[in-house]
Structure formats: structure tokens, C-alpha cells
Amino acid sequence: MAPNTSRKQKIAKTFTVDVSSPTENGVFDPASYAKYLIDHIKVEGAVGNLGNAVTVTEDGTVVTVVSTAKFSGKYLKYLTKKYLKKNQLRDWIRFVSTKTNEYRLAFYQVTPEEDEEEDEE
């Protein structure tokens, strides 16, 4: 029997991150986030080796990552958390999955706590 010579075509995975909420408040810069992803994504074990395998585009309040190489949503979440920590935004903004391969940055829900001192007085 002859060996199968047909190769599988690489399927492009698309990940979208909606950064509209923190961008509207002026605490988040989508352009610097996209640049951070470009500078830190590893392809085949090397940083800065994107080539044609991974493309990162920033379109207003949406950052899109298209990959034909091995890339996961968990890795995108890891890099985003690292970016938020570096810019001291990790305490206020979180990375939330909305659908498969669709994410958004959202502020933590803060519930006002009543001071016990005011109740006692």
C-alpha cells in the first residue's frame, strides 16, 4: 500500500479580545496591549518568532489574534494577566470568556460595603 501523501491543511484559529470597557474609561491602551502580545507570544519555543504563523491586529476596541501554529486561549489569558500585572491593572480588570475563542476585559464587580462603625453610632 502506498503511503498517504496528502497533508492536512493548517486551520487558522481566531481569538478576539474585546477591550472596550477599560478603554472607554481611559485606563487601558489597546495598541500597547497588541504590541505586548506581538513581543511576548512564543512560536515553536522562541519569542519574537511569529512569522506568518501568528498575526495580532488591533481595531479600535477589539484585539484579534489569528494563529495557524499551536496557540490556546489559556496562553492568551496567561499573557493578558501578565500584561495587566505589569501595568498595575490586575487588581481592577479581569479576563473573561464570553464564547468559544471570544474574550473581554471587564472590571471587577465591587459591592459597596457598609461600615460597621456607622451602624454602631
Curated annotation (Swiss-Prot):
GO terms for biological process: cytoplasmic translation. GO terms for cellular component: cytosol; cytosolic large ribosomal subunit. GO terms for molecular function: RNA binding; structural constituent of ribosome. Keywords: Cytoplasm, Ribonucleoprotein, Ribosomal protein. It is found in: Cytoplasm. It comes from the Eukaryota. It holds the Pfam family Ribosomal_L22e. InterPro entries: Ribosomal_eL22 (IPR002671), Ribosomal_eL22_sf (IPR038526). Belongs to the eukaryotic ribosomal protein eL22 family. Component of the ribosome, a large ribonucleoprotein complex responsible for the synthesis of proteins in the cell. The small ribosomal subunit (SSU) binds messenger RNAs (mRNAs) and translates the encoded message by selecting cognate aminoacyl-transfer RNA (tRNA) molecules. The large subunit (LSU) contains the ribosomal catalytic site termed the peptidyl transferase center (PTC), which catalyzes the formation of peptide bonds, thereby polymerizing the amino acids delivered by tRNAs into a polypeptide chain. PANTHER family: 60S RIBOSOMAL PROTEIN L22, LARGE RIBOSOMAL SUBUNIT PROTEIN EL22A-RELATED. Component of the large ribosomal subunit (LSU). Mature yeast ribosomes consist of a small (40S) and a large (60S) subunit. The 40S small subunit contains 1 molecule of ribosomal RNA (18S rRNA) and 33 different proteins (encoded by 57 genes). The large 60S subunit contains 3 rRNA molecules (25S, 5.8S and 5S rRNA) and 46 different proteins (encoded by 81 genes). Present with 60400 molecules/cell in log phase SD medium. There are 2 genes for eL22 in yeast. This is Large ribosomal subunit protein eL22A. The gene is RPL22A.
